[in-house]
């Protein structure tokens, strides 16, 4: 019988909106969303699954210290790990186009020249978890 996989929460904090993602330990996305930064913990509570999480991976950007304090206060049982978020938005845009390949004439263009039609904060949170998992397996 297969062992159950662990699930990680990724958080890409921002001033107005924050990316949140749930990612399995094999790097596959369970779900991702963009949540309002105001009253984040309440919105996050609704986003979280019933099952326990293996940890929370937080990007180290501008508002990360405030977000870390809020997460530690509101979710004290959740281990918190900080990762470098440099370039995560660009990586998230690449991931967007992998998940949603361009159609029609846009498929002829390099995806680097295309803008994602929606915000990618949730996918940036996915990228943060995938970085953490990659670094964790290398060590």
Segments from the language model and where they lie:
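Phosphate- and other anionic-substrate recognition elements at nucleic-acid/protein interfaces
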Residues: 2-9, 15-139
């Amino acid at each position: 019988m297969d062992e159950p996989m662990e699930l990680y929460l990724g958080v890409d904090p921002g001033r107005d909106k924050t990316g949140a993602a749930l990612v399995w330990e094999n790097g596959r996305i369970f779900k991702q969303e963009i949540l309002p930064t105001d009253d984040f913990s309440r919105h996050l509570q609704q986003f979280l699954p019933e099952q326990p999480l293996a940890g929370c991976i937080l990007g180290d950007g501008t508002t990360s210290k405030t977000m870390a304090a809020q997460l530690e206060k509101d979710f004290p049982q959740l281990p918190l790990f900080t990762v470098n978020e440099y370039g995560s938005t660009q990586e998230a845009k690449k991931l967007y186009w992998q998940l949603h390949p361009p159609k029609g004439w846009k498929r002829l263009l390099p995806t680097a020249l295309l803008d994602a039609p929606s915000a990618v904060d949730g996918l940036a949170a996915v990228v943060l978890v995938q970085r953490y998992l990659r670094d964790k397996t290398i060590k």
